[in-house]
Amino acid sequence: MAAAGPPDPLELYRWAVQDPATHVVVLSRMYARLRNRQPAVLREDFAGTSAESVAWVAAAAPDAPRGYPAAAHESSAGDDRSALAVDHDPATLAWARRRAERLLGERAGRVRFVEGDVLSVAPLDACGAAHPSGAAPPEVPAADVISVLNFSIFHFHRRENLAAYFQHARRCLAAEGILVLNAFGGPGAMRTRIDRRRVEPVPTTGEPAPPPFEYRWEQRGYDAVANRLDCRIHFAVDEADGGTTTIENAFQYDWRIWTLPELTELMREAGFADAQVWRHTWDASKGKEGVFLGPVARIENLDTWLAYVIGVR
């Protein structure tokens, strides 16, 4: 019998980088804080593994898989929850669809996978001129929440392209919808570096875990003129015989590091009623009760900071 090959890089990425169960709680709380009700429809742009979409639907089930909070704790939307996962790569979406079917069973139909440019996918009532490709955009629902996580907003390099995306996202939202993205910055974001972290996967969602592995995040180069960052992800996976299988350049990114003022200003210019920066902060004197998620007016000069940016329609 042939030896099994190394795990799919998408699987390793899912375990090393993403925390979808936490993300769907965060997205729900943001919406509830801003709109005083629970969201039902999530759209995940640049979806990749579509982990947030799967977790969104899983959390709505009373028998949610282990690792996902049941909707009763976070949501009154319950069985009304559905998700739309948009990505341009067919192989990645096929992997994500198989994972959704495995984890969600008959509820997998509540996640719709759409292959295409995020700028070509819109509700029918939001469609203006034909997309340059000539293809009619698929009919999709307006979203309560559009998520652009894993720093995917940095794929846009030019101001006019980012502005066009924000305008499009606003049109794709329901009347009280919000756009949520995350960003990072600080001196550490511009420094050449390699960060290593050991990952010991423990199944929490009913899916088999890959072998233990090392996750390596490399910031290979930074261009101060264009504010562009060359990033790579590598993996070194444990083998049964004690060796390792190395997957170099499993993922590569050419990102423009947008600043928080640029992002909030462009959101407002795109027609959003408000644009806010949110962070997790912690008051050590309050212990577990000291964790706070909410808007901030200032971020101190940290070596590397992380933040959410919310466009409020």
Predicted regions and their residues:
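A short acidic, Gly/Pro-enriched loop at the edge of an enzyme's catalytic core
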Residues: 124-146
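SAM-dependent methyltransferase
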Residues: 181-265
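Conserved SAM-binding loop of SAM-dependent methyltransferases across substrates and taxa
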Residues: 49-79
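Conserved class I S-adenosyl-L-methionine
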Residues: 38-48
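Conserved SAM-binding loop
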Residues: 96-97
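C-terminal lobe and adjacent flexible extensions of AdoMet/dcAdoMet transferase-like proteins
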Residues: 251-313
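Conserved SAM-binding strand-loop segment of SAM-dependent methyltransferases
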Residues: 104-124, 128-131
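A short glycine-rich, Lys/Arg-flanked "PGG" loop and its adjoining helix->strand segment in the class I
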Residues: 162-175
